[in-house]
Amino acid sequence: MERTIRVTGKGNLSVKPDTVRLVMTMEGMKEEYDAALEESAHMTEYLKQMFSDLGFDCEDIKTLNFHVSAEYESYQAKDKSWKRRFEGYKYVHRMKIEFPADNKRLGKVLYKLGHSPVRPEFRIEYTVAEPEKCKNELLANAVTDAKAKADVLSKASGVSLGEIITIDYSWAEIDFVSRPMDKLMLEECCMRSCEPDEAYDIDINPDDIDVIDNVTVVWGIK
């Protein structure tokens, strides 16, 4: 039976976010299904035009999720029984747009959103432009750590490492995201406006994004 050593390496990586991700949600309710679709399409078109006026490409806005559902309200009838009545068709459209981190440009975007009749709910996230490159570096760090631990253990045990037999990696999704602003901070930020430039005075310096991942490597020993 082949002798083996199994070691789990931990990879650590700290990356500076370089991209703003704006996640926007628009929702509303209409009595008719077609009316709900029409209003959603109208609001989306308005939003795309707004970003186009700011120098973005309409294709930069990506849909994350869109659905229309029938909404009902529960109520108690005169006979004390509980029943449901139809309220309307509710649409929810979640979108995102990403652009290089730039407080001045972000301030202009937030100003336009704050003065738009559409007024979608939104949150600001910071991420990286090349997540795959960061994931590969993180994975390499984990393998390097596993090898260093295996070297220590094999030398202490008086054996030497052979060939790698297996490498086990979870392939879990790693989200490189920093959310430096909560809702209250965002509202305070948006109160500091600069009317002549039609932009909010945004001063955000997001912290580095710290991520950890593990890799388990099995070596033969001799």
How would you name each of these model-derived features?
Residues M1-K222:
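Short, charge-dense linear interaction motifs
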